[in-house]
Structure formats: C-alpha cells, structure tokens
Amino acid sequence: YTDKANTSLANKEINLLWTASWESTIGTNDLVPQNAVYDITDLLKGTTLYNSMDAGQWEATKYNGKNYFIPVYKDNVEGYDLMFRQELVDKYSWDLSTVKKLADIEPMLADAKSEGLKYPFLTQKTAMFYRYYINSFDFFTADATSNWVAVDRDTNEVVDVIQTPEYKEFCDLMAKWAEAGYISEDDVTKTTTDTTTQTQDWAISWWTDIPVNAEANSRYNQEVAMVPITDRWAHSTSALGSCYCITANSTEEQAKACIDFMGLLYTDSKLADMYTFGIEGEDFNYDANGQIAKTENGKYNHSMWESASATIVTPEAGEPADKASLYKDFNGGANTSCAAGFRFDKTPVADKYAACQTVFEQYGFALENGGVASSEVDSTIAAYQSALDEAGYQDVLAEFQSQYDAWKK
C-alpha cells in the first residue's frame, strides 16, 4: 500500500489518501514537511465533517497550528496489553492478576515451552521497546526505527534511549528468553506472518489496547485474554494512528468535495458500513440484533480503525451495543503526555536521521527480538551506539533537544 500510495502521490493521481503517524514514507511526519498535504483549516469549520467529532480531536491533530489531517475517531490514545491464549490460561491455571510487568510472564513461558509450542512468546516480528516502555518515555517519533530518542517522563528532557538502564534491561530480558527457547528465530528473521496469531503455535503476544479488546477473539479466530502492561497515554501522534488527508495538488473545489465525502463517511452509517465491511449480502449481513455478521466467503478485509468513526460504524456481532460510548470513555481516561503537542521537524537533519534508522535495522531490531546472545548484549549496545554516532546521531539528538526545549518555552 505504501509504495502504491507514494507513487500515486508523486504522479498527482489522487486527492484523498489514508495514512497514519506510524506509516513510513507517506506518514504524517513525512507529508507535512514535503508540503504534500492540503491545509484544510479554513475549509473545516461549520462542515458536517468538523461537527462529526469533538473539537479536541481537531486540536490534537494539528501541525504548526493548522489542520492537514482528518483523524479516524477510534482509540485515539496509546496503551499496550499482553495477550494470552485462553486455552492455555485454562489448562495451566495461569493467574493473570500476578502479571504487572513483562518479566512476570516467565513462568508461563516455561509452561508454553514444555507444551512444545513454536512461539511461546510471539513478538510478531516487532521491536517493542518503544511500546512496552511508554510509561517511562514519550517516543514522539512513534516509529520503532527511531526509538533511539525520546522524552524521559521523569525529567521532561530529551534523552539518548540506547544509554538508559531501561533499554539494557529490555534487551537483556529478550536475550535471556531467546536462549531459553521462548522467542523463535522466526521473529528475528521476520519470517513469522501476520496470520501467525491465528494459529495455536503461540502462547503470549502483545496487543494494542482498545475499548473493546474482545475484538481480538474474532481477529485471531480463538479466545484470548488481555492484561494491561502499560498505562494509556495521549501523545502527539496517538490521535493520528489512522487518518486521511487531502493532497496538496488538489484544487479548492476538489478539497471541498473531499471534505463533503468524508462528512458523509463519518456520519452516514450505511456508507460507513459499506466502506468498512463491503457489500451487504456478499461480504456481510445484519443479524437479528442489527449487528454486523461477516460472511465466510467475504473478500473485503477492512477494519473500523482504518475506515470510519467508531461512533457510526455498526458494531460487529458479539461486540457491545454501546461501543460508541465505550470509545468516548476510553479516550477520556488516558494520561496526557508532557510532550503532547510537540512534533519534531527532521528536515534540518533528514539525511542523518535516515542513516540512524538504517543503523536501528542493523542492531536495534535484533537486540529487541532476542537476536543477540546474553553475553553479547552489552558489547552490541556499545557497537549500536558507536554506529549511530558515526551516522550523525549526536547531531540528530541535539536537534531534537533544541526543538523540544524551544517548544517547552
């Protein structure tokens, strides 16, 4: 999708685009500096689209005081859970109430290993430090490949994450688990797939916390249980985890047409259901309770979070009928980060920033997925830092610190 969308952008073939803060190449932090998106600030007020959500959503998604993006109203705060296959919870009588931090699941991983499972701890080929440790840091880049810089919540200062005790703690734990056989080499080599979670080959993985976590049962075709491993936080990027934008090549007439269409998508349940679930009678049906029942042969594969507002998309069968109010309560119950509202402009150090991201792929990903022996974690972290510095990291860090200090004033 990213490649196709980027090509269409370059060729000026499109007016409306879905993106997200975590997307690469076409992410929100890429498009604004490139002047690739339309400033819709003056076109929004008084429209059906603007009135479809509270003003706070529009404020939270501004860049430099201007609206460029149309947030999908969903779980617009950030938090993470550990996800357990319920079958194993029942079989081994795991007491999930004892799980307060990541290391607490170690006895359960031992059970999963004895079960003969291929993936006792499934990382889903994801470097997770920047998610598991959001109680300590605001990783305002919202990108694993640049998790080497963050705001320390205790000091409200930008820090070199690689040098923190927390980073070493996490890498040591992942190395230990890999050597115990709890993490598979498949995650390190990125050969696990997006459907591995639908199998019975794993025991414990991660999940992005949402108002209705029971959605995971249908997504993974099995019952799972969730335990929060972080608090929920409102970040600069959390409300942009799924959004739309109008391309800068659009005329004002085209931009207004896009806003009119999005107003319908965010307020008309029939259109929202069609865009989210496909064709009624072919991809889905409404059950006796008026909820969505997907068909077995349905070919449409969208989800609410990437489609339309949670307040208007019809809940799926088995979901709470009051899903809309659950989302409003969920978003309202989060902590607000000290760095909420800050957006880093990487333009002054773009080449060095990109070079540091490449270094992450060389060192950071393996460190965070158990791909480094326990005896070599310290030396690898040192080599990682050295390679970052050679790539220009200190200049990038200084630019982060300068921009953040200026923003705090």
Task: Locate the predicted segments by residue.
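Extracytoplasmic/secreted envelope proteins and their assembly/folding machinery
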Residues: 2, 6, 28, 37, ...
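Histidine-centered catalytic/metal-binding microenvironments
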Residues: 364-409
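Second-shell loop/turn segments in exported
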Residues: 92-98, 157-161, 344-349, 366-373
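Hinge/lid segment of periplasmic solute-binding proteins
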Residues: 24-81, 130-170, 219-231, 245
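Helix-loop-helix "hinge/cap" segment bordering the ligand-binding cleft or interdomain interface
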Residues: 62-132, 147-194, 247-256, 264, ...
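Conserved small-residue motifs centered on glycine
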Residues: 257-371
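Extracytoplasmic "Venus flytrap"/periplasmic binding protein-like
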Residues: 1-56, 62, 87-97, 114, ...
